[in-house]
């Protein structure tokens, strides 16, 4: 079993969504309607992507935000999510943060440059690429947006050191690349 499939199985088990583990991983194709879907999303000005970039993919994420108790307080540890389009797993999201294409192995790491709060959910984010690997879907990504977030907030209250909690969340992730010159 491939490492990507093992990861999909682990995330699906964590979410209790066994059907995700059965998703086929054939040739990737970003749907032509992705940009149209994105136009319907209200994006706060603070997390808008700078001019000179074009959206190359809009994917729906289902996963967990994992927190760990350290010195009696909850702190963020890592995300684990499967990003899909029309029910087909295309990208894995994990600690770094990093996003990796399950089809071509390309990846992007990024750092947060802006945040917009969301009631009862993790914030919406604008992240700038800090590195890319390999040609393919994510090989030239310059910016990533996390939009339409639900859930994923840190646990509250007292905790025992070393304890972890994985909190389900969903979001839309928009991937952007520089406009060709």
Please identify what each model-predicted range represents.
Residues 1-18:
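N-terminal export and membrane-targeting signals
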Residues 16-26:
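Bacterial N-terminal signal peptides
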Residues 24-40:
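C-terminal region of N-terminal signal peptides and the immediate post-cleavage residues
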Residues 35-64, 72-181:
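Primary mode marks residue(s) on the alpha4-beta5-alpha5 output face of response regulator receiver
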């Amino acid at each position: 079993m491939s490492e990507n499939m093992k990861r999909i199985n682990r995330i699906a088990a964590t979410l209790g969504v066994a059907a995700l583990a059965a998703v086929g991983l054939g040739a990737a194709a970003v749907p032509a309607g992705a940009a149209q879907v994105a136009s319907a999303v209200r994006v706060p000005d603070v997390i808008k992507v700078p001019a000179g970039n074009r959206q190359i993919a809009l994917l729906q994420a289902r996963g967990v935000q994992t927190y760990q108790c350290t010195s009696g307080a909850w702190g963020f540890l890592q995300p684990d999510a499967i990003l899909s389009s029309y029910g087909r797993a295309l990208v894995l999201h994990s600690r770094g943060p990093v996003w990796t294409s399950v089809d071509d192995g390309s990846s992007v790491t990024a750092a947060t440059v802006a945040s917009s709060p969301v009631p009862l959910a993790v914030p919406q984010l604008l992240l700038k690429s800090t590195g890319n690997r390999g040609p393919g879907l994510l090989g030239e990504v310059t910016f990533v947006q996390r939009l339409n977030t639900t859930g994923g907030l840190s646990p509250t209250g007292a905790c025992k050191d070393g304890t972890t909690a994985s909190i389900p969340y969903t979001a839309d992730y928009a991937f952007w690349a520089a406009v060709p010159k």
